[in-house]
Amino acid sequence: MKTPNNYGLIPLKKSSNSNTTHIFVNGFMSDHIEEIKALDWQKGIKKYTNPSDCKYIFHWDSGLDYTRFKTYLPFSNGILSELERATYLLKSIVDDGLVKGVLKGIPNYFLDEWKEAQNNLKLYANLLSQEIYSMKYENQNNKIYLYGHSLGTNLIKETFKNLYKQNIKIEKTFLFGGASSGKSSEWDKISNVSTNGIYNFYSKNDDVIKYLYRRLEEDDNPIGLKQISTRSNNIFNIDTSHIVNGHMEYKKKIDTIFKKYYSI
């Protein structure tokens, strides 16, 4: 299907003989060529999939490309705005130390991009649900696996809302370091869209979710820090705090996580 600005599903591995499809969804600030190649995702699940399986990255407008920091214009919003942001960042560092202070103060620099990415979510969730609908229409036996990291988990949640209305099912879903709310009212109804389970991998060591996400969203229940609160028996919450020490470690440690907790 045609998607705006070449966003949408990008094939990483296609096969006409496969009934299994894996779709990866990256998070905030992932609009960069290395992220689109999805080498980390592919390496992480390699032992648990067949060589003939189809693999796609869902490329979406996820906000600021971090490579654009090279051309960042510090006073583009005026000197007072820049001073205010710098003052808050400095105060956070003084109060909480360098690492935690930066994570608490830096959201001021990302706020516009974060809002843009969140606003884009429903549009791209519509696109992803249409892509999945097309796959299932072409091959009802196609087992579709979804993998999401960070804000990509929220895009998957919005996609599930669409699939629920269309009565479309996928096979399984894996969420890592989720930048998404864990309220039961949002998850219970849509949990059975993923027929054989939604696996939520979280870590109490995820400072990005703990400080940056919670400041941006004012949400005390992100699924990247704690369990999804749910009455559904189709959602499995798995604490990986003893394996994952930070937000960017999830994709590097998928093999370790799957080896211990799950086999596709």
For each predicted feature, which ranges?
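C-terminal catalytic-base region of ester-bond hydrolases, centering on the histidine
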Residues: 209-264
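Hydrophobic anchor at the start of a short beta-strand
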Residues: 55, 144, 148, 235
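Short, surface-exposed "cap/lid" segments of acyl-processing enzymes
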Residues: 6-97
